[in-house]
Amino acid sequence: MGSPSLYSARKTALALAVALSFAWQAPVFAHGGEAHMVPMDKTLKEFGADVQWDDYAQIFTLIKDGAYVKVKPGAQTAIVNGQPLALQVPVVMKDNKAWVSDTFINDVFQSGLDQTFQVEKRPHPLNALTADEIKQAVEIVKASADFKPNTRFTEISLLPPDKEAVWAFALENKPVDQPRKADVIMLDGKHIIEAVVDLQNNKLLSWQPIKDAHGMVLLDDFASVQNIINNSEEFAAAVKKRGITDTKKVITTPLTVGYFDGKDGLKQDARLLKVISYLDVGDGNYWAHPIENLVAVVDLEQKKIVKIEEGPVVPVPMTARPFDGRDRVAPAVKPMQIIEPEGKNYTITGDMIHWRNWDFHLSMNSRVGPMISTVTYNDNGTKRKVMYEGSLGGMIVPYGDPDIGWYFKAYLDSGDYGMGTLTSPIARGKDAPSNAVLLNETIADYTGVPMEIPRAIAVFERYAGPEYKHQEMGQPNVSTERRELVVRWISTVGNYDYIFDWIFHENGTIGIDAGATGIEAVKGVKAKTMHDETAKDDTRYSMPHAPVRFTGRSLLNRFHYFCHALCWNNIFPIKNLSAQKDWTLTYPWCNSVIACYRRA
C-alpha cells in the first residue's frame, strides 16, 4: 500500500533540512545542552502537518494524519491524542513567531501516542511490490538474452500466491510457503511480452510473447505524438486551413483507434493512435477550443503521420472558457474543522486496515488503482470471509456521434491508459476531509523505475447520519450515530477526474461510489446559438439539456460505464449499484461478480 504521506522518510528528511537551514541558536536548553531552535510554522508545514493558532486560548493545534496535538508556548508538556507528553524543549515565542527544537517532530509525532500506524510483524502475501522489488524484477528481465534495449514496461506487479494460502495467512496467520513473484508486462515496439520473475531466488521463470493483442498507451507516447505533430508539414497545412499558423499552440490528445474490421482503412496489427487536437489560446483550458473534423493517424513505430482524416472546416471556438478553475472565486465561508482529539478509530498495520469489525488489505495497481483484498467481518466473534479481492475491473466511455472525429471514441480508460498510473494526488481538506490519512503509493513507470505517487489514497472515518432514535414519553432519549470508513482514490484521465470511494458500513455492507468532475469534452460546431441556420444539424447527437453551449460548442451524448471485479467469498445480493441501470456477470467457480453500472 505504501507509506503514510506525512510519515515518509523523504518528508522527514526534507523537514529537518529546512529546519536546520532556518536554525536559531537560542538560549534554550535540553538535557543540559543548548537546543537548536527552528521556526514552527515553516518546519511543520514542510513536514506535512497543519498548524493552527487559537489567539483567545493562546494555544497551538497541530494535526497530522492520526496525531492531534495541543501545545501552549512555554509549556513543558503537550497533549497528543488526549494524552500528556513531556517535551524536551518547550515552544518558544520570539517576535510573535513560534520556535521549536529540531527534535520536536520526532518527540511529538513519533512518540507512540498515535496508534494509527502499527508495525507489520509479518508481511501480508498480497503486499504490492516495493521499490526494491521493482528494481530487482527489472534487473532480472533485462539480464535475459531476449530483452531488447528499447523495451518499455507497461505493468510490473505482484503475481499473487495461491488463494488458499493467502486466506490461511489472513485467517490463521499461517506463513505462505511460496516465493514472491513479479508479473512483468513489456512492450517491444508493437509486441507484448509477459515475464514472470522469482524474486526470492532471483531468476526468470518465464518469457511469453502475447499474440493478437495491443499494448497500453504509455506516458512517453504522449510526448512522441506531440513531437510528431509539431514537425509534420502535412498537419501544419491542415490546421492552416482553420486559421492556425503556429502548430506549437496545438495540444494533441492521442487516442486508441478502435476496431472496425478494416473498414476504416487501418492495419489492425500496427501500433496506431488517432490524434485529435485543441488550440491553446492562453486561457488555461484548451479543452474549450477543439480543432474539429481533423484527425491525424500516427504510427508509433514509424514515428510519423500515416493518414489525415478531414471533414468540413469548423471554426475553432475562441471564446475564453478558463474552466481549469483559475477564474473561480471561492465563496467566503468560515473554516470548518473535523478533528479526532483522541486519535483514529482505525489502525493501519503495514497494508492492513482494521476498523470496527472490518479487516482488509489495501494495495495499488498501476492499471486499476486500489485493490481491496482479504476482506473479513467479525460476526459476533467469528471472522467471516467476505471478499477475496475487489477492484475497478475496467471502464468505457463511448460517445454517440458518427462524425469523423468522434465515431471511434470509446475510451477504455483503465485498460488503455492505466488509471493507477494516472492517479491524482489528493488535496487535504478539499478532495478529502482534513482528518483523512493520506497514503503514498509506489508503482513502476514505463522505464521500469519505481515511481512514488504522493497522497494517492485517502482513508477516513465519517459521520453517516443517525443510526437509531426513539423518544419514549417520560423516558430518556435514545439516539445512536452511524459511522462509515471511506477509502478514496482519484484518477485524472484527460479532461475527466474520476473519484472512487470504497465505503465500509458498520452493518457489514460495502458500497462503491463513483463519479466524475473535471472539464466536459465538447464538440466544435458552426452554430453560435440554437437560432442559427446550422443549429439543428450541429446538435443532432447532442445531449438534450445542452445542445449548443458556450458559443460554438456542443455537448455530445456519452456514457461512462464503470465495471468492478468483485471476487466474493460469500454471495450477497448486489443492490442499489446505480440510479440508472446495472447488471452482473457471475462466475461460480471463483464466486466472482463483475458489477457494471453507468453514469450519463
Question: What is the predicted function of each stretch?
Answer:
Residues 103, 107, 111-117, 187-202, ...:
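Hydrophobic, ordered structural segments
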Residues 33-38, 93-99, 173-179, 188, ...:
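Short, low-complexity cationic-aromatic patches
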Residues 163, 215-600:
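Beta-strand/loop-rich accessory regions of lumenal/periplasmic or secreted enzymes
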Residues 52, 62-66, 79, 118-244:
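Post-signal-peptide, soluble extracytosolic/periplasmic N-terminal scaffold domains
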Residues 72-78, 88-94, 198-202, 229, ...:
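A short, sequence-level motif marking secondary-structure junctions
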Residues 2-11, 15-122:
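Primary recognition of N-terminal secretory signal peptides and signal-anchoring hydrophobic helices
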Residues 59-62, 75-81, 184, 353, ...:
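Short polybasic amphipathic segments
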Residues 38-43, 99-100, 105, 137, ...:
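Short, structured motif recognition centered on aromatic/hydrophobic residues
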